[in-house]
Amino acid sequence: MRIVHFMKKENSGLARCCLELAKYEERLGHKVVMKEPSNDMAFYGTEGDGADIEVIHSQLPPEHYFNQLPKAMVQHGEPLSSVGNGVSMKAICDLANRVDFFLCFRREEWPIWSMIKRTYQVPKGIDLEVYKPLDGITEKLPGEPAILYYENMRGQRNPLYLLVAMQEVYKRFPKARLYIYNMNDKKMQDTFTTFSRACKLWACGVVGFEGPVNDVNLLLNRADIVVSCLYPLYARSIEAFGAGKPLICPGYREPGYEFTCDLDPASIADAIIRAWEKYDRFDARAWACERHDVAETVRQCVEIFERYAR
């Protein structure tokens, strides 16, 4: 089967997800091409004639609107943000009558997307060959526990509630330390630097605010616990499980997961404390292999594609 993906060539979680899908589609023996929607040019795989199915991750070139090829649209973002940014939900609805079906990754969002179009839900996976425990990590981040926040920050996606939660974590574990990475926006950095000084956050284990790193898996391996403040869903922070680290995230509600919490500083603090107290009893890597293997995500996607492929 020849699968053509349309996605913006950029450095983002969405792009990493798409590249993982392509890698494992090829492993199943399929030909994969990834194209930039703005110019319809391939930047991954080999240009060729036609496709058996086209998969939209952000936009679709207008010249493909009426080519009669089967089409899927993958819903990477969560519905509330798609409405909140003033653009995405309208674009999704406008394209809905050009596609055969939607794909989503989390059962909580299925009822919303399925109102617009027939929607299939597949498990959200990560590349477990990339996100994995590393032997011989000697430069662990100081702290017991060393807590990491590395999610891309924008708008309401930020670590404010985690910073507040650190007061309670620090009372329980005075050696606890919080590290904030991947802060790219200068206004966001200025805001949190000022907030940190005003609240004297250094006194409750907040170490500082750093920019992005090249090796995310190495950073994950240097930490003990990873925290995301996303709600009501979750995103790429499940990479933590692949690296063998527990994840604290208000939007992560997988059945059977011990360390769930609400979007509330006290609840986040409680989940961090529980995760550290039970640290040696939870196998995060095994959880990732069971629940978040992108190879299984792709296997299920391909089964669906084959029902519609030309």
Protein language model features and the residues they cover:
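A charged, aromatic-enriched C-terminal amphipathic alpha-helix characteristic of glycosyltransferases
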Residues: 13, 262-263, 276-310
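Glycosyltransferase donor-sugar binding loop
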Residues: 36-38, 177-193
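Acidic anion/phosphate-binding donor-loop and adjacent secondary structure
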Residues: 83-84, 125-140
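A short, active-site helix/loop in glycosyltransferases that binds the activated sugar's phosphate group
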Residues: 93-121, 126-130
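Conserved donor-binding/catalytic core segment of Leloir-type glycosyltransferases
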Residues: 139-157, 163-166, 179
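Nucleotide-activated donor-binding/catalytic signature segment of Leloir-type glycosyltransferases, i.e.
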Residues: 192-211
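Acidic donor-binding loop of glycosyltransferase active sites
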Residues: 221-232, 245-246
